[in-house]
């Protein structure tokens, strides 16, 4: 090593970015490598999400559709095969109501329960719920049970 080939130790220096906009003598003065005029040359520039250079953005070109019905009721569905499974496991015997749905985590206490017709119900049950589908009501009554609306 001699004075003609001095260099910093390995890993002691980091790639420092060139300081721009600090006078013509620095080599990066004037426009500070931003080019001439335009939005990108201005201070505080950041491209807005969805901005397409002034072209009408996709989000505004596509038509709007649909709406959220504020009066919509959200039902928690319980199928007949689930009720039959509870009977087979000995959890319920002759009747099932909201307290049973809550106890078996099929619905929470504030939810509206609707009995749906998937599966087969063999047990004679008195089912108490907020709503029934036509097929579910028919299946409960065909098994000798009773469908009671709250």
Curated annotation (Swiss-Prot):
Part of the 50S ribosomal subunit. SUPFAM superfamilies: Ribosomal proteins L15p and L18e. This is Large ribosomal subunit protein uL15. GO terms for biological process: translation. PROSITE patterns: RIBOSOMAL_L15. Belongs to the universal ribosomal protein uL15 family. Residues 1-53 are annotated as: Disordered. One of its GO terms (molecular function) is structural constituent of ribosome. Residues 1-15 have a biased composition (Polar residues). Residues 23-32 have a biased composition (Gly residues). Keywords: Ribonucleoprotein, Ribosomal protein, RNA-binding, rRNA-binding. It comes from the Bacteria. One of its GO terms (cellular component) is cytosolic large ribosomal subunit. Signal peptide: none annotated. The keyword Ribonucleoprotein applies. Coiled coil: none annotated. Binds to the 23S rRNA. NCBIfam families: rplO_bact (TIGR01071).
């Amino acid at each position: 090593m001699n004075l003609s080939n001095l260099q910093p130790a390995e890993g002691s220096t980091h790639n420092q970015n060139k300081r721009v906009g600090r006078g013509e003598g620095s080599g990066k003065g004037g426009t500070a490598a931003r080019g001439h005029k335009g939005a990108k040359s201005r201070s505080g520039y950041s491209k807005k999400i969805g901005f397409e250079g002034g072209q009408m953005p996709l989000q505004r070109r596509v038509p709007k559709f649909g709406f959220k019905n504020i009066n919509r009721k959200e039902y928690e569905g319980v199928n007949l095969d689930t009720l039959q499974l509870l009977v087979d496991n000995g959890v319920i015997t002759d009747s099932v109501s909201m307290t049973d749905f809550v106890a078996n985590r099929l619905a929470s206490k504030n939810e509206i329960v609707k009995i749906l017709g998937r599966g087969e119900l063999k047990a004679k049950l008195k089912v108490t719920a907020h709503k029934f589908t036509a097929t579910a009501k028919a299946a409960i009554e065909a098994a000798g049970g009773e469908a009671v609306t709250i």
